[in-house]
Amino acid sequence: MAQAMASMAGLRGASQAVLEGSLQISGSNRLSGPTTSRVAVPKMGLNIRAQQVSAEAETSRRAMLGFVAAGLASGSFVKAVLAEARPIVVGPPPPLSGGLPGTENSDQARDGTLPYTKDRFYLQPLPPTEAAQRAKVSASEILNVKQFIDRKAWPSLQNDLRLRASYLRYDLKTVISAKPKDEKKSLQELTSKLFSSIDNLDHAAKIKSPTEAEKYYGQTVSNINEVLAKLG
């Protein structure tokens, strides 16, 4: 009996020791599991941060290299352009208003000291003697419009005729005003006759009629000669 009790006690002690051992093993597993996971998570986070920082550094480095390359390329382009620069050759001044007939009025000198009235932008008055000389020049220019009639260049004929007639009318008015009273009337009649034929010639150019242009050009030439004879 005593022997049986001793064997039962031995079995109980052995089973208790086995149970305690299993508890210790399982307890160590529970403790080691979370400890291992807590250590692993920070390591993974550190790895991710390191990778992000390295990627940003790589992007910045590439951007800087691209900027430097663009700067070098633009600098070389500017140097090439400057190397190929050629001096600009400045020639003589162009003809009056491009040399087109009927546009010389824009090249006439104006008195910039005058106030902003019509006198500043219209033909400036000349003394009677100088006005007579300019009237002769305008009359000779009117005689040269025959070339436009021959070429049937009607716009050029009108432009040149009107320009010269404006000078001639202005200067003849100055000359007539300085003449004695007995000479004014005859010169005014000749002037009126002259500008009547000029107006008819302008109308012939407007309707593009070679026949009428020839007719009124002949009358204009005759009237100009009479006026110039009076001017002396």
UniProtKB/Swiss-Prot annotation:
Residues 1-83 form a transit peptide. It comes from the Eukaryota. Gene3D superfamilies: Oxygen-evolving enhancer protein 3 (PsbQ), four-helix up-down bundle (1.20.120.290). The keyword Transcription does not apply. It is found in: Plastid, Chloroplast thylakoid membrane. Its main location: plastid. One of its GO terms (cellular component) is extrinsic component of membrane. GO terms for biological process: photosynthetic electron transport chain. Residues 92-111 are annotated as: Disordered. Keywords: Chloroplast, Membrane, Photosynthesis, Photosystem II, Plastid, Thylakoid, Transit peptide. InterPro entries: PsbQ-like_dom_sf (IPR023222), PSII_PsbQ (IPR008797), PSII_PsbQ_pln (IPR054099). GO terms for molecular function: calcium ion binding; electron transporter, transferring electrons within the cyclic electron transport pathway of photosynthesis activity. Pfam families: PsbQ (PF05757). Belongs to the PsbQ family. PANTHER family: OXYGEN-EVOLVING ENHANCER PROTEIN 3-1, CHLOROPLASTIC. This is Oxygen-evolving enhancer protein 3, chloroplastic. It comes from Spinacia oleracea. The gene is PSBQ.
